[in-house]
Structures are given as C-alpha cells and as structure tokens.
Amino acid sequence: MTRRVKTGIPGVDEILHGGIPERNVVLLSGGPGTGKTIFSQQFLWNGLKMGEPGIYVALEEHPVQVRQNMAQFGWDVKPYEEKGMFAMVDAFTAGIGKSKEYEKYIVHDLTDIREFIEVLRQAIRDINAKRVVVDSVTTLYINKPAMARSIILQLKRVLAGTGCTSIFVSQVSVGERGFGGPGVEHGVDGIIRLDLDEIDGELKRSLIVWKMRGTSHSMRRHPFDITDKGIIVYPDKVLKRGKVLEL
C-alpha cells in the first residue's frame, strides 16, 4: 500500500480517496485568482501541524510578503522556521536588498537551473523536508517554454529522490485549456485544476482532479470556497452546467 500524505484541506483528501500518494509531484494549475497559492500554503501549513517539515519556494512574491499573507489565515510559519521545520527558498529577490541579511536560502540566478536545484536540495537536507511547494514553477520556464518538461523532470528527480511530496503551482491564462507549459502534464504524477467561472453574473470556484498516480479519485468537478481559514472543498457537491448539485 502506498503511504498517503494528507493535505488536511477540508474535502480534498476525500476527493483523493485518502490523500496524495507519498513522493508524488502534483501540478496545481489554474488562472489568476483561483486560489492556487492559498491551496499550496495550506498544504504546507497542515504538514507542519502534523510534524512534517516543509519548504516554500517563492518565485512570484517577496518572501516577507509570503509570510505576511500566510499569517492572515492564521498560518504563522516563523516559530517553525526557528525550530528548523520550515524553510523559505528566496527565488524572487536574487539576493538584492535586505533579503540577503534575512534569508538563508537564496537563488541568485534563475536562469541557472542547476543553482536553483542545488539551493533547494540544501534546504531539503537541512530541515529533512517532507513537503515542498514551488510557486510558481511557470516562472522557471516563462522565457524558454521548450524547456518546461525538462525542468519539471529535473525537479521531480530531486524531490522524489529525497522522499518529498510536492506541489508545483502552474499558471494558465483565463480560458486556457492547457495546464501551463508544453508537455508539463506528462512530467508530473498528478494534476489538480482550480477554476473560476462566471455563471449567471456570479463567479464560482471549482476544483477537479485530472490525474493522480497511485490512487483512484473523484472524476467530478467540486465547488469550493476561500474563507478566512483557507480553502474548503465540498466533496458531496458537484458543479454541473453552471449549477451546484448535491450528490
């Protein structure tokens, strides 16, 4: 039996029939405002509460901002950082400004994937990480889309090899059918897609699991909400032709 890693996000483990299989790399794909970052941070935070060390790789936002945003949901990672259970990899500032005084793990040149992987590997070793979030993986190949699948596979090799279960946040434009980068869907073990659709003049949030190696899962599109405590998914409801139906 494959060991499961519980996301701890209400409704998600039910949809995944018990959680994410250990060592899986999951692409969390969606357009702007769909809740990808919140989902990934909630996954890390719940891991910390379960005693599983975690790493957040910040590519889109200043690490200080990331910590502040997490704290707004009541997810204060600072005590865990001090205990050596949580690490932030700064792949945003390139070590410019004050971050070089505050951040322990800094990627100076994002075009150098080897440096990126080495910094990440060091952080994993130092805290014995079990969960890793890369937000967003799209940033790594935004200027070289042809490299997307290769970069995903290089990262996957390191993460699965160190026993981590990982979420790669992937950005897609509004209305895009793909998952954010050519061939990336073939390089990962799982794909969870978050959507925000306008239905009768109202925006509705939904989640669907496109694939997940090592487990069966719900094949339906489930509605979810973002609250002041994070994401809540409704496994007993389904979004169908713009209407929320009870299962």
Swiss-Prot record:
Presence of the UniProt keyword Nucleotide-binding in the record: yes
Domain KaiC: 3-247
GO molecular function: ATP binding; ATP hydrolysis activity
Source species, domain of life: Archaea
Keyword set includes Ion transport: no
Key words, A-Z: ATP-binding, Nucleotide-binding
One of the Pfam families matching this protein, by short name: ATPase
UniProt: ATP binding residues: 30-37
Family: Belongs to the UPF0273 family.
Name of the featured protein: UPF0273 protein PH0284
